[in-house]
């Protein structure tokens, strides 16, 4: 499918979706705790439903009531588990792999064609070092894991994905010995690790930080039943803010901001550096944009999901926008650096692709084009917002938004966007 996107202005109120990362983590931890654990204000999307289905395969009894998930009975580690298909969700397969290593019987985990291109080897090596038997297809899914891991000393690289570390942390308290975790190389996406630890603490597990982002100790413990409220998703909020900056007129973004750590909240600072005035209330955000953005140099090493919403702001920037230290964005659902470079140049802006980022510079010759999002949800949304600014665009793969923001097109059209399926 494709969507036709015409030049358009948005105004009014729009509600930001709940946080995908916290929804994943809270569902897994509620499923490990059971006993009526409840996750409120969840994001119900294709990715998070993959986590729900994985937990059910592990034996958890889960009910969905409106925007809440209730876990009556926890994961059963003596269960024979059928193959788990995590669809397109990298978070699901990585955390589920850690949990699978707590079972004695072999468990197979797989995903769709895109997921089968994403690396797993660093996590598999770490699990193997503490007693798991792991098989894969050249370090990628499908994978087979046989436990049971006993715990102990584990070393894992931090420069691929923080999801590997999150998987080890979540499984650690349920091992016989606990885990002493050492992270080598520079850790990317640090705030996502903070999110994992914050969620674990909400479910009663203590994580001892020996050296931040380098060494952690998790002793044998149990997860306790809890109620967890998911905050808004700053990754999705960044896209809505970009839409308001480029195309907004009195646009108000509503949602439960909360006080849990989110790496992508740095987008507020980025907007202010670009010259945007941002007013944050208890449950809403308003912005006021200058006629032209300032441009600047931005390090996205800890927030790779901000690459799509930041790149499109170059359309209305008087100076170049340079994005650095985000090489790991090439390992997302797609190679977001390469695809962004390839597609945005069609709109008439100048793009220099570097190994770890991009330099983007607007021109006076912006023009509509067909933009191929390669079935990447964040690229689809970013390209639609760009199309609203430039006009006369076509964007491929609208179905991709099911993984993070299923109502994106409908909600944007409700406040004035002109995005029509073809």
Curated annotation (Swiss-Prot):
Location(s) in or outside the cell: Cytoplasm
InterPro entries hit by this protein: Enolpyruvate_Tfrase_dom, Enolpyruvate_Tfrase_sf, EPSP_synthase, RNA3'P_cycl/enolpyr_Trfase_a/b
SUPFAM superfamilies per UniProt: EPT/RTPC-like (SSF55205)
UniProt EC number: 2.5.1.19
Gene Ontology molecular functions: 3-phosphoshikimate 1-carboxyvinyltransferase activity
Annotated catalytic residues: 305 (proton acceptor)
Pathway stated in the Swiss-Prot or TrEMBL entry: Metabolic intermediate biosynthesis; chorismate biosynthesis
GO cellular component: cytoplasm
Keyword S-adenosyl-L-methionine: no
Catalytic activity: 3-phosphoshikimate + phosphoenolpyruvate = 5-O-(1-carboxyvinyl)-3-phosphoshikimate + phosphate
Role this protein plays: Catalyzes the transfer of the enolpyruvyl moiety of phosphoenolpyruvate (PEP) to the 5-hydroxyl of shikimate-3-phosphate (S3P) to produce enolpyruvyl shikimate-3-phosphate and inorganic phosphate.
Family: Belongs to the EPSP synthase family.
Quaternary state and interactors: Monomer.
Name of this chain's protein: 3-phosphoshikimate 1-carboxyvinyltransferase
